[in-house]
Amino acid sequence: MEGNIVSGKAVADNITNILATCISDLKAQHNLTPCLIVVLVGDDPASQLYVRNKQRKAEMLGLRSETMLLPSTISESSLIEKIHQLNNDDSVHGILVQLPVPRHIDKNLIINTIDPKKDVDGFHNENVGRLFTGQKKNCLVPCTPQGCLYLIKTITRNLSGSDAVVIGRSNIVGKPMACLLLGENCTVTTVHSATRDLPDYCRRADILVAAVGIPRFVKYSWVKHGAIVIDVGINSIEEDGVKKFVGDVDFAEVNKIASAITPVPGGVGPMTIAFLMVNTIIAACNQSGIDGFLEKYLDL
């Protein structure tokens, strides 16, 4: 048996087409163009690539998107002042500070300086708190876990009662992913580097989400027959003298036992960017007092 390879790119492209129509109608009906500002501190090549991809996608959809380029030497206080200016600008609906930031800057302080209504990454303490207290409809949810859940729902709509295992406990993916799965009435187990007998937990999973950052960490023998496997990892390795990207799952082997699996690249990555656009539209509508507009186009 080989699993159904779930193309995040194909699903994200479909979402993009839907969002383009939504934004066009938003402009026509409410004279509103959602605006996303990405703050990039320093000149890290990987961060520059991520930012270009986000801006390209925003422009494709008809969003207004700008990148604020700041030197790596900027002081923490100056960066905070820049964010306050964006918070106070009513034409700006979404603010994203590209991570990582230089070591002399407190990442958590910066995240929590962003107005939570404009925090399209969903990392602000207020958004996290609302998500973890069952107020998903009243907050901005982190993009990658949202994208993962959407992919899972393209495979099966009824998740209630499923055993779900999340490998990883980061604030960006692991914890919010577990919370979203709990919201779907899954029985959720979070495992991590200190978990004893980690493979045994994985073998119980109807849904297995790998977000640990270790190349090909999840082996064939760890996976239940027919499981849905979502691979969040993106790891650069060199193999036979060739650099390539691989996930946290041993794709070639696990694909033989899973009922559905996401590839790397082309799986979760495109979904993350798609849901950044979703969050920007939600933020723009919320700030403009427009209720339920996106839900007419996209079932979240």
Curated annotation (Swiss-Prot):
Pathway: One-carbon metabolism; tetrahydrofolate interconversion. It comes from the Bacteria. NADP(+) binds at G168, R169, S170, S193, I234. GO terms for biological process: L-histidine biosynthetic process; methionine biosynthetic process; purine nucleotide biosynthetic process; tetrahydrofolate interconversion. PANTHER family: C-1-TETRAHYDROFOLATE SYNTHASE, CYTOPLASMIC (PTHR48099:SF5), C-1-TETRAHYDROFOLATE SYNTHASE, CYTOPLASMIC-RELATED (PTHR48099). The keyword Hydrolase applies. The lineage of its organism: Bacteria, Pseudomonadati, Pseudomonadota, Alphaproteobacteria, Rickettsiales. Belongs to the tetrahydrofolate dehydrogenase/cyclohydrolase family. It holds the Pfam family THF_DHG_CYH_C. Its EC number is 1.5.1.5, 3.5.4.9. One of its GO terms (cellular component) is cytosol. Keywords: Amino-acid biosynthesis, Histidine biosynthesis, Hydrolase, Methionine biosynthesis, Multifunctional enzyme, NADP, One-carbon metabolism, Oxidoreductase, Purine biosynthesis. SUPFAM superfamilies: Aminoacid dehydrogenase-like, N-terminal domain, NAD(P)-binding Rossmann-fold domains. This is Bifunctional protein FolD. InterPro entries: Aminoacid_DH-like_N_sf, NAD(P)-bd_dom_sf, THF_DH/CycHdrlase, THF_DH/CycHdrlase_cat_dom, THF_DH/CycHdrlase_CS, THF_DH/CycHdrlase_NAD-bd_dom. Homodimer. It catalyses: (6R)-5,10-methylene-5,6,7,8-tetrahydrofolate + NADP(+) = (6R)-5,10-methenyltetrahydrofolate + NADPH; (6R)-5,10-methenyltetrahydrofolate + H2O = (6R)-10-formyltetrahydrofolate + H(+).
